[in-house]
Amino acid sequence: KKIGAHPGTRKLYADKLATQGLGESLGDDMVKAYRAAMDAGKHTVDPVLTNFKSKYAVDWSPFLGKKWTDAGDTAIPLAEWKRLAEKITTIPDSVTPHQLVKKVYDDRAAMGRGDMPVDWGMGEHMAFASLVASGYPVRLSGEDCGRGTFTHRHAVIHDQKREKWDIGTYVPLQNVADNQAPFVVIDSILSEEAVLGFEYGYASNDPNTLVIWEAQFGDFANGAQVVIDQFIASGEVKWGRVNGITLMLPHGYEGQGPEHSSARLERFMQLAADTNMQIVQPTTASQIFH
C-alpha cells in the first residue's frame, strides 16, 4: 500500500519542474506529445548513431522483392577455375603439412587440373575461393570448422615443425589474390546457442558476406534451437528483418555415436513457410560449389 501510494518518478520530476516555474501541466503535455509522436510513427528519441543513414543502418534493399526461383549464374570460366585451384592447393615451402593433409592437397591439385573427379571438400573450397576472389567475404564459424567434421575441409594447415602453437598455420583461402575479400575460419567455443546467436547478429549487419555456422555434427543444432525458432525461422515475419545466415549441418556418418547421425531435418521442414528459409541436401560436389 505504501508503494502504491508513493508518487512515481515521472510525478516527482514533473512536480520539481513545476516548482521551478515551468508550468503545472508540463509533465502531462510531454506525455501527450510523446504518445502523439508514436501514433504518427515518428522517432521519439534521437538515434545514437550520428551517421544513421536510413530506416535501417544496414541496406538490405537490393535483396528484397526477389524470387527464390530465379536462376543465378554461379559458373566461372575454366581458366579462372584452374587459377584458383592452383592458388588454394599451393603450400609454401616454409610450411610442413601432416602427411595425410598433404595427400588431401595433392589430390585437390589433381582435381583442379582435371586429373581426378572433384570431391565435396574441393567443391566447397573452390566456391569459397571464387567468392573471395570476386570481393565477397566468407566467414565460417563452428566447433570444428578448420578441419571439418568429416576431415574433409582442412582449411587451416598446421606446420608440423612449428615450435609455438600460435605461430605456424597457413590458410590457403586467405592467399587467393592480393585484393581478395577476407576469408575467416573460426574454431568456436562449445556453445551452439551463443555462437549461432552471435553469427546471426553478424549476418544481419553484413548482407554481402557469406556467414556460415557449422554444427560439428548436425545433431548439435538442437543446442541452438531457440535461435533457430525465434530468429532464423520467424525473424522476418515478426520484425521485418531479413538475414542471410547459412547453417551447415553435417550428418549421416554412421558409426560415430547416437548423437552424430541425424541433423533432424524434419524439424526444419516443419519451420519452413512463406519462403522463410531454404533447406538443401546436396548430393554432388557441383551442388556444393554452385
Predicted segments with their positions:
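Flexible, glycine-rich loop/tail regions that form catalytic "lids" or insertion modules at the edges
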Residues: K1-H290
